[in-house]
Amino acid sequence: MGLTKIRLGDYIERSTVNNKNLVYGTDLIVGVTNEGVFSTPKGNPIGVDLRPYKIVNHGAFVYNPTRLDLGSIAYREDGLCIVSHLYIVFYLNEAGKKIIDPQYLFIYFRRKEFCREVTFRNFGSQRPEFSFSDMCDIVIPLPPYAVQQKYVAVYNAMLANQKSYERGLEDLKLVCDAYIENIRENAPLQKLGDYITPCENINFDLTYGVPDVRGVNNQKD
């Protein structure tokens, strides 16, 4: 499988089309999360001037230039929306559409390695901001279009399996919660202290060193 290195700027074009005529209202406002999805903003948009808001159509890439290193980039596959003027919006140009699968490009952007590259390029900046010019300078290894489509199909299948697994876990959690609630209501109460003992074993003889030190986080890991 041959890879071709391309400069992204040769295959993308920026869009600055805004909502200057106020055609679109607050119901179409979205933002981009660090998880790479569009979401409705939490703030109250009433009274906000929507004229500078950028119009986003199907096929657009939208990213936050100050949070791209955290994964704040999304690919628009749904209908039209509008985003803050602070976001950068771009599309594949005609040349890009011929050789780049947009979903493959989005998968590339979502990689941790890409986030690290953004961080590296921003290093030393007083106010780290990944401009469209910076995005254009990105060089990516690109497999043939058919191979990109295969990667996308495998990736989407893995996501579907993961979501199915997560739904199964939620169903199992509901069953367990119901079972525990039934026990709480019907089983006789007993003191937990009758079944547990404290452990105060201390590393006096230094059998264990720094590599053995562990803590407990909020996820109980």
Question: How should each PLM-predicted stretch be described?
Answer:
Residues 5-20, 24-61, 193-221:
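Sequence-specific dsDNA recognition surfaces
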Residues 114:
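Internal, well-ordered alpha/beta segment that forms a basic, Gly-enriched binding/recognition surface
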Residues 104-107, 117, 137, 150:
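Short, solvent-exposed alpha-helical surface patches in well-structured domains
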Residues 58, 62-110, 221:
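A short beta-sheet element
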Residues 30, 73, 118, 130:
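Short clusters of hydrophobic/aromatic residues that line enzyme substrate/ligand-binding pockets
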Residues 81-88, 123-149:
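A short glycine-rich beta-alpha junction/loop motif
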Residues 1-19, 137-205, 215:
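Non-catalytic DNA-recognition/assembly elements of restriction-modification systems
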Residues 69, 83-86, 134, 207, ...:
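A generic structural signal for well-ordered coil/turn residues at beta-strand boundaries
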